[in-house]
């Protein structure tokens, strides 16, 4: 498979999970060259090791992911093995959206088929990548889904606006570390761009974590030893200066630092078709 002009060429394989196949047969009917056939599960169970290896060891190739239709299919789907009906179009759309935005995605899901296969009791077809990032999903049975989704969008926007204000205050602190200020400014500069903001958000979290002084670290500084003793007597664990206080508060909401992609999923329920 050629990634594109001036990019790499890769070997491509399709590994099937015998334990997760839903048995619907849609893939067999859709294959244009009759390359697939349905067989008894028992004889294919040894192939589970192949599937597990591919999931665990094969990494995404970034130069295959150029947001074209072809390129999107080499990204990890974060919707898998749902209990939807055979050939369900809803899951095809939802899977594609997770391939494009799944690692920074919020979903407000209307009640209907899309909430039944999307959030059945005790399980979820939505998954995470190796970094533990994936879609955050929510459904409200008795609330209009447009309002529910708008509320999620507005709420996280307000939290991020507050984080931006705190970040500007942090940059203004005279003694804040230069590397922390640089990371903070890089985050501010990209905070409204979902693609560009991903790496600056990670770097900002790392810089925040490294910038906070503990009381024990303060005690090792002769000029701050007395203040450290006062903090220790109060049971404090961290420095209470403006920079450390702001950094700790920003870190308490770090899941909102990365720009999110907000989606409202409908379905037959929202369309008044059930």
Sequence positions of predicted segments:
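Short acidic, glycine/serine/threonine-rich loops at helix termini
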Residues: 26, 47-51, 118-123, 128, ...
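Thiamine diphosphate
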Residues: 91-96, 106, 116-120, 182, ...
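N-terminal amphipathic, basic-rich helices that act as targeting or association modules
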Residues: 71, 79-111, 115-121
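Iron-sulfur cluster-binding cysteine motifs and their immediate structural context
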Residues: 1-2, 9, 13, 17, ...
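Gly-rich Lys/Arg/Thr-decorated short loops/hinges at beta-loop-alpha junctions or inter-strand turns
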Residues: 3-13, 69-80, 143, 182, ...
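Amphipathic alpha-helical binding modules
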Residues: 222-249
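Mobile "lid/hinge" segments at catalytic clefts and subdomain interfaces of large enzymes
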Residues: 119-157
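N-terminal leader/propeptide and maturation segments of large enzyme subunits in energy/redox metabolism
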Residues: 141-171, 175-180
